[in-house]
Amino acid sequence: MDPQINPAITATANSHDGPIETDAVIVGAGPVGLFQVFELGLLEIKAHIIDSLAYPGGQCIELYPDKPIYDIPAVPVCTGKELTDNLLKQIEPFGATFHLGQEVTLVNKRDDGRFDLETSKGTRFITKTIFIAGGVGSFQPRLLKVDGLDQFDGSQLHYRVRNPSAFAGKNLVIVGGGDSALDWTLNFVQDGPNKAESVILVHRRDGFKAAPASVAKMKELCDAYEMQFIVGQVTGFEATEGQLRSVKVTGGDGVTRVVPLDMLLVFFGLSPKLGPIAEWGLNIERKQVVVDTEKFETNVPGIFAVGDINVYPGKKKLILSGFHEAALAAFGAAPYIFPEKRIHLQYTTTSPKLHKVLGVETPVFD
């Protein structure tokens, strides 16, 4: 399931002694963080990437590696894993170094304008610029609060689907009313390698915060007796011999029903946690970092924020928007890296210089 990262990348990350001096540090290895490497690389700016996960890809890999994504330009459909793998391949020419499984714990500005940065594993950097591309920060799933249920977390209680095949042939209860709950419900009901034995969807009300087409399809499957939908909330459970056997679902009518299961999947969304980012002296609005829209720079010169972590008038949380932000942020950062150099806009279609950077031959047209 993990993305196809070159083992030499992580080996390089482990070979440093003392502070690492670099042009740029990118905090977050999701799609926007990875594309930030590409845009910086075109300007010959070297970058190191830090992520709290043990693998690149961010939410795409952690939350929906197998879900289809339809809004990437010129790519009619791809999964989160495919998008991550393609981005990793795209940035290979730039030799970015990954520092995975660690979080940034300290950022201080030096007298010379650069930044001291340290991670939870003690990795230290001296960098000219910082790019925060950490999605919604360090995100955690919102938990189903039923006393004692957490003992089954990771065995029969799941807040993420890492391996869909593990649920094939099982009796599933899925709790939630958003896109993730509906998408996985449809995935496990319909014919395919991951088809479950049975699926019961539980939501506290009859309304959903999901795509109308998904809701309509779910109701169609219920009418065909291929699955069941129950309006109610999980208020308890039954277990024997250390195994979760059923959940108790209390409906709006006050009646509690016992629902047998093999696996319980809960999709209540994410609880964003900015963590140490909140202590960097940045302007923060509703747990998002305020930026300008010229360079996507924060109120601290030299620190940029791209992707879902930032906020500005008209902000849309789309991967496409993050790619655009990464391009402008790279140009905005260039004067910090090359203060005496004038940066010219070049095109990968025609620039021999960029072709050399990318390691490709310049085409010759008749």
From Swiss-Prot:
<keyword id="KW-0521">NADP</keyword>
<feature type="binding site">
    <location>
        <position position="139"/>
    </location>
    <ligand>
        <name>FAD</name>
    </ligand>
</feature>
<dbReference type="InterPro" id="IPR022890">
    <property type="entry name" value="Fd--NADP_Rdtase_type_2"/>
</dbReference>
<dbReference type="InterPro" id="IPR050097">
    <property type="entry name" value="Ferredoxin-NADP_redctase_2"/>
</dbReference>
<feature type="binding site">
    <location>
        <position position="104"/>
    </location>
    <ligand>
        <name>FAD</name>
    </ligand>
</feature>
<comment type="similarity">
    <text>Belongs to the ferredoxin--NADP reductase type 2 family.</text>
</comment>
<feature type="binding site">
    <location>
        <position position="64"/>
    </location>
    <ligand>
        <name>FAD</name>
    </ligand>
</feature>
<feature type="binding site">
    <location>
        <position position="51"/>
    </location>
    <ligand>
        <name>FAD</name>
    </ligand>
</feature>
<dbReference type="GO" id="GO:0050660">
    <property type="term" value="F:flavin adenine dinucleotide binding"/>
</dbReference>
<keyword id="KW-0560">Oxidoreductase</keyword>
<comment type="subunit">
    <text>Homodimer.</text>
</comment>
<feature type="binding site">
    <location>
        <position position="349"/>
    </location>
    <ligand>
        <name>FAD</name>
    </ligand>
</feature>
<feature type="binding site">
    <location>
        <position position="308"/>
    </location>
    <ligand>
        <name>FAD</name>
    </ligand>
</feature>
<keyword id="KW-0274">FAD</keyword>
<dbReference type="InterPro" id="IPR023753">
    <property type="entry name" value="FAD/NAD-binding_dom"/>
</dbReference>
<dbReference type="GO" id="GO:0004324">
    <property type="term" value="F:ferredoxin-NADP+ reductase activity"/>
</dbReference>
<protein>
    <recommendedName>
        <fullName>Ferredoxin--NADP reductase</fullName>
        <ecNumber>1.18.1.2</ecNumber>
    </recommendedName>
</protein>
<feature type="binding site">
    <location>
        <position position="59"/>
    </location>
    <ligand>
        <name>FAD</name>
    </ligand>
</feature>
<dbReference type="GO" id="GO:0050661">
    <property type="term" value="F:NADP binding"/>
</dbReference>
<dbReference type="Pfam" id="PF07992">
    <property type="entry name" value="Pyr_redox_2"/>
</dbReference>
<keyword id="KW-0285">Flavoprotein</keyword>
<dbReference type="InterPro" id="IPR036188">
    <property type="entry name" value="FAD/NAD-bd_sf"/>
</dbReference>
